[in-house]
Regions:
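Acidic two-metal-ion nuclease catalytic site recognized across multiple nuclease folds
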Residues: 1-8, 151-152, 164, 168-196
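P-loop/Walker A phosphate-binding loop and immediately adjacent motor/lid segment at beta-alpha junctions
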Residues: 114-119, 182-184
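Conserved non-catalytic scaffold segment of RNase H-like nuclease domains
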Residues: 2-111, 115-117, 143-155, 161
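Short alpha-helix plus adjacent loop in nuclease-associated cores
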Residues: 121-141
Length: 196
């Protein structure tokens, strides 16, 4: 299991990644920011990314506060590909919040090599079993936003929707979950029950 292996892994081999984008469609929207820290919280990579085609994203700008002025002189994603690929290749464990379903596929769609040997730990998916909000309609536990998870574990003083702030909050939540034996035991039990 990724959790048990991660507990033994050196913090320098653990990375936490987050991106901000112009929208949620990985085939048509573009990346605006990529942030990666290691398991000690050291920033390995943090940069705005200049979109190749888009100069306006009003709906998501309201959320992430990233405007054209923030990114117009930033490097493009393909310019930064080698740096990001190198960090991902060296990782033993890649942590994120909804990165299994969003960040990693989005990066892959833009040419970043996410097919690495590292284990993947999605804090959002694991936390859904701890948060205990069952969705009868879909027959599964509801996914909660990072702000909810962070608040649950007492991490409240951060600016959500900035990739660097989000990776710091995610890493904090990851370590809090590792220490939350009662929550993890309940999560394992709920997973088994849900898969029966």
């Amino acid at each position: 299991m990724a959790t048990e292996a991660a507990e033994r892994m050196r913090k320098s081999k653990i990375i936490c990644i987050d991106i901000e984008t112009t929208g949620i469609d990985r085939n048509n929207d573009e990346i605006l920011q990529v942030s990666i820290i290691n398991g000690r919280g050291k920033t390995l990579y943090n940069s705005y990314i200049k979109p190749d085609y888009t100069t306006e994203w009003k709906e998501t700008e309201v959320i992430n506060k990233i405007s054209w002025d923030c990114v117009k002189f930033a490097p493009g994603i393909l310019t930064e590909k080698r740096k990001i690929d190198k960090i991902l290749r060296k990782a033993g464990l890649i942590i994120g919040y909804n990165h299994k379903g969003f960040d990693l596929p989005f990066l892959a769609a833009k040419g970043i090599d996410t097919a690495v040997k590292a284990q993947i730990y999605d804090v959002m998916l694991e936390f859904s079993y701890i948060a205990v909000d069952y969705d009868e309609k879909h027959g599964n536990y509801k996914w909660k936003p990072l702000t909810y998870c962070a608040k649950y574990y007492g991490y409240t003083d951060y600016k959500a929707h900035d990739a660097l702030e989000d990776v710091r909050a995610t890493l904090y939540c990851y370590y809090a979950m590792q220490k939350d034996r009662k929550g993890r035991a309940a999560a394992r039990r709920r997973k088994r029950e849900n898969n029966e």
